[in-house]
């Protein structure tokens, strides 16, 4: 059983062990879908739902599943929650579901979800397990949204375009255009732009971590001197 506190679980999911920036998992949907903010939010919310549900379920049955069928059982649980997320999107956000296409069912193959189920949920009680799933999901969603906003803004010159696909007619006029006349940059909308954007985000996180580490080192007090001195003795004693 893990001895992590709630604050450690939160920090790991959001920053220190972020599934996208540190573990670098789930790259296929992350790079393919994040051309706009609304696509990123749709996939991120579906992944968050699956992470929380699968972590909770795995934690509840952790004492009843033998080692030999552990992984197949986890995959079946994850697939069940992915099916639930897929049906919900078909019912309430069908147009967005059509845009995301195969990447919703492919959540089953996201190594981050199976990894959390095996490494954490199967060894911890339900409350820490669902908290871990929530924080990992929110951390993944935050990276998706940031990358989607970067690619949409640089690639198309807009933000929050097509939000009505997720939130209905009330969000139809939420689109932001910082520049009226903006030459579209197709490179950022295509997969190579996603690689560049993700690389910049990872570099930014590593730079922040290094800066904080240097600040902590500078703030540490210098070791206190004992006041004793060593005397070097040469020659022989007769």
Swiss-Prot record:
The keyword tRNA-binding does not apply. Signal peptide: none annotated. One of its GO terms (biological process) is electron transport chain. GO terms for cellular component: plasma membrane. Keywords: Cell inner membrane, Cell membrane, Electron transport, Membrane, Translocase, Transmembrane, Transmembrane helix, Transport. Its EC number is 7.-.-.-. It is found in: Cell inner membrane. It is a multi-pass membrane protein. Residues 215-238 are annotated as: Disordered. The chain crosses the membrane at residues 30-50, 72-92, 95-115, 127-147, 156-176, 184-204. InterPro entries: NqrDE/RnfAE, RnfE. Its main location: membrane. The complex is composed of six subunits: RnfA, RnfB, RnfC, RnfD, RnfE and RnfG. Part of a membrane-bound complex that couples electron transfer with translocation of ions across the membrane. Belongs to the NqrDE/RnfAE family. This is Ion-translocating oxidoreductase complex subunit E. It comes from Marinobacter nauticus (strain ATCC 700491 / DSM 11845 / VT8) (Marinobacter aquaeolei).
């Amino acid at each position: 059983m893990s001895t992590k506190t709630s604050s450690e679980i939160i920090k790991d999911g959001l920053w220190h062990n972020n599934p996208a920036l540190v573990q670098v998992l789930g790259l296929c949907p992350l790079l393919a879908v994040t051309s706009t903010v609304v696509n990123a939010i749709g996939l991120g919310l579906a992944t968050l739902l699956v992470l929380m549900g699968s972590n909770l379920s795995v934690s509840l049955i952790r004492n009843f599943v033998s080692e030999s069928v552990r992984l197949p059982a986890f995959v079946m649980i994850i697939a069940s929650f992915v099916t639930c997320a897929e049906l919900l999107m078909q019912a309430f956000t069908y147009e967005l579901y059509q845009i995301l296409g195969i990447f919703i069912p492919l959540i089953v193959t996201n190594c981050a979800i199976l990894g959390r189920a095996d490494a954490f949920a199967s060894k911890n009680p339900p409350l820490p397990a669902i908290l871990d799933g929530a924080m990992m999901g929110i951390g993944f969603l935050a990276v998706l949204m940031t990358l989607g906003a970067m690619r949409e803004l640089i690639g198309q010159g807009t933000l929050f375009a097509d939000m009505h696909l997720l939130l209905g007619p009330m969000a139809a006029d939420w689109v932001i255009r910082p520049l009226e006349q903006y030459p579209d940059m197709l490179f950022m909308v295509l997969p190579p732009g996603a690689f560049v954007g993700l690389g910049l985000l990872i570099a930014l996180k590593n730079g922040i971590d290094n800066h904080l580490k240097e600040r902590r080192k500078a703030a540490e007090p210098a070791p206190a001197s004992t006041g004793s001195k060593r005397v070097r003795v040469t020659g022989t004693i007769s």
